[in-house]
């Protein structure tokens, strides 16, 4: 193909993958992003029915299936998903972009562990506060603890009607997280082919991170289901990549 041997094509692919990750990977590792406007995002989420006026994004974890490894099978196995996998944590905003991505971690790790290891709590405490000191918050599923900058659904078997309504309203708006994951797999289908995702033989984590970066670029150019739902445009591609 293209006058090149298969091993040579693989080397070229991996070099490009590494270059993209080296040059732009920082765009997914901290919240120092010029396009990040928590007040505008919170208003957009509130207008779609959220009972929270200060919620600007949604956090969730995803487990990407991998081929059963020869080594460390127990570490890579998720008892909840009943498969071998690597896990990522992402934070998605109403303009359809993944603004923070952490991973990969071993499949046995819990979402709360990923949150602690990611350093996101420190980033939120540093960046996401109003002028009067009140916090902007993000919302996640029940796996996440309630903290100053993170909220999750009410838990328990005997919830009040108000608590049930809160959970239902937030569930309706936080589906954008699943749309974000779905778009990555839609455009990079090979990531969903677990038999070819071989830890120690392929850069499985780097593949997913670069795919997320490229999907963000696609959203900047063409929008997404999330941008249409919240009516919030993504930044220009040049603004996103240059972060200025």
Language model features with spans:
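Short, well-ordered secondary-structure "scaffold" segments embedded in the functional core
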Residues: 1-244
């Amino acid at each position: 193909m293209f006058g090149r041997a298969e091993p040579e094509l693989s080397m070229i692919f991996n070099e490009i993958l590494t270059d993209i990750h080296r040059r732009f990977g920082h765009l997914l590792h901290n919240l120092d992003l010029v396009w990040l406007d928590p007040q505008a995002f919170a208003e957009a989420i509130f207008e779609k029915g959220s009972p929270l006026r200060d919620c600007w994004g949604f956090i969730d974890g995803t487990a990407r299936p991998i081929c059963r490894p020869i080594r460390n099978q127990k570490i890579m196995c998720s008892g909840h998903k009943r498969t071998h996998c690597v896990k990522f944590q992402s934070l998605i905003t109403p303009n359809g972009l993944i603004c923070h991505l952490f991973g990969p971690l071993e499949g046995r790790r819990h979402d709360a562990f990923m949150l602690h290891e990611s350093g996101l709590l420190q980033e939120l405490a540093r960046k996401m506060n109003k002028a009067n000191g009140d916090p902007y918050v993000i919302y996640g599923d029940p796996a996440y603890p309630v903290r100053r900058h993170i909220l999750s659904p009410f838990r328990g078997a005997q919830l009040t009607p108000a608590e049930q309504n809160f959970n239902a309203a937030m569930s309706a708006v936080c589906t954008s997280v699943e749309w974000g994951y779905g778009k990555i797999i839609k455009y990079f289908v090979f990531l969903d082919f677990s038999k070819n995702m071989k830890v120690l033989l392929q850069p499985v984590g780097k593949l997913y991170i670069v795919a997320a970066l490229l999907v963000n670029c696609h959203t900047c150019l063409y929008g997404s289901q999330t941008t249409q739902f919240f009516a919030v445009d993504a930044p220009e591609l040049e603004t996103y990549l240059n972060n200025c």
